[in-house]
Design a protein with these regions (language model features):
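A short acidic (Asp/Glu
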Residues: 79-86, 104-106, 154
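Short, solvent-exposed loop/turn segments at secondary-structure junctions
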Residues: 76-78, 98-100, 148-149
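Conserved class I S-adenosyl-L-methionine
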Residues: 65-77, 85, 93-96
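Donor nucleotide-activated moiety binding/catalytic core segment of transferases
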Residues: 55-64, 142, 146-155
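Membrane-proximal basic amphipathic "stem/tether" segments
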Residues: 1-41
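Long, hydrophobic, well-ordered secondary-structure blocks that form the structural core
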Residues: 91-116
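Conserved alpha-helix/loop element of class I SAM-dependent methyltransferases that forms part
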Residues: 46-69, 80-81
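S-adenosyl-L-methionine
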Residues: 110-152
Length: 155
């Protein structure tokens, strides 16, 4: 229902509405459940893989991932980059201003399935119950304290 309404509204009304609604006491996850606020679409496996492929192609590291560390600023609703990086024998450090990544492991399992179908070797996360379990399996980091997190990024 909200999606149909959102499509019909001019862009400027959406901005005004978001500014007004952001002042309410609801958390980001509450707004996300209502489909009113979302930090991108990286929870969608196909979309996440497409974005990753675009970025690594533009960066020139497409063919040489081994041992690389990928830094993602503002991963939004997902830690998908960590899983995709590990599938390419690399690791990822994700930095955001808050813990916005979905705790639901199903999108991450679906991503691993897609990566496997593409001939990659995704990390084993079938027994993972938390984001920490997934990050551990991927040798990844998810830093969620904004500018303070930069001090924790190893060079």
């Amino acid at each position: 229902m909200f999606t149909k309404i959102k499509r019909r509204l001019p862009w400027w009304t959406k901005i005004v509405a978001k500014l007004v609604l952001s002042r309410s006491p609801l958390s980001y996850s509450d707004w996300q459940k209502l489909a009113l606020f979302r930090h991108g679409y990286m929870h969608d496996p196909g979309y996440a893989l497409g974005v990753f492929d675009t970025h690594v192609t533009r960066s020139g590291i497409r063919e040489n991932f081994h041992g690389k560390t990928i830094l993602e600023i503002g991963p939004g609703d997902s830690i998908a980059t960590t899983i995709i990086s590990r599938s390419h024998d690399a690791r990822a450090i994700l930095v955001d201003i808050g813990p916005f990544a979905t705790e639901d492991t199903l999108p991450y399992l679906a991503l691993c399935e897609l990566l496997g179908k593409q001939g990659l070797k995704p990390p084993e996360i079938s027994s993972a119950h938390t984001l920490e379990d997934i990050l551990l399996a991927c040798d990844g980091e998810y830093l969620t304290e904004g500018l303070t997190s930069w001090k924790q990024v190893s060079s």
